[in-house]
């Protein structure tokens, strides 16, 4: 991978644990935190995909809020406005994975420009990064807001090429979401899939270039390959 000149990371589920909202959900709905988090994330993604197909873009905060309303209705849980806001805000305070900071620090030390490309709005990306004290880490924070469509639309991945300033074949795309990794590969990025759950990759034509178990393994592999 000596031709890699920069790296772009997915945010939700790759650098940050989306299920770190379980605690906030559990505080409001004891015994339901895990079920809420999992269905909430599932519907959040479904709404981004469906809105892209329908040409009805809203920002990620709105998609997340709508997914939470569905989740609570489906699970038979009462959701007042105050609780809705409290839980939605939890998505702005996600916890980085334990290996995120060290992996990013090692890649920066190797001289690689780093970026995030996310379905999140500019505001939400900046808040997640700031709230976790990771402002030092990234050269580019890239939002789908600039093209008004969500991943896996190819226009999103094109943003990374433009903002990072390198040809797509020289930008490593890193994601733990198999559908995202496949779409990025289809666009033309070399792709590293973070397979934390030891799962099967989606049966789509485009496959990742490299598969690892976590960000620590990814940074070790890449830095060693650059030597």
Curated annotation (Swiss-Prot):
Enzyme Commission no: 3.8.1.2
Ranges in a coiled coil: none
pH note: Optimum pH is between 10 and 11.
Gene, per the UniProt record: hadL
Name of a matching Pfam family: Hydrolase
Active site: 10
Lineage: Bacteria, Pseudomonadati, Pseudomonadota, Gammaproteobacteria, Pseudomonadales
EC main group: hydrolase
Family: Belongs to the HAD-like hydrolase superfamily. S-2-haloalkanoic acid dehalogenase family.
Residue numbers marked as site, Important for catalytic activity: 14, 151, 157
Role noted for this protein: Catalyzes the hydrolytic dehalogenation of small (S)-2-haloalkanoic acids to yield the corresponding (R)-2-hydroxyalkanoic acids. Active with 2-halogenated carboxylic acids and converts only the S-isomer (or L-isomer) of 2-chloropropionic acid with inversion of configuration to produce R-lactate (or D-isomer).
An annotated Gene Ontology molecular function: (S)-2-haloacid dehalogenase activity
Protein name: (S)-2-haloacid dehalogenase
Record keywords: Hydrolase
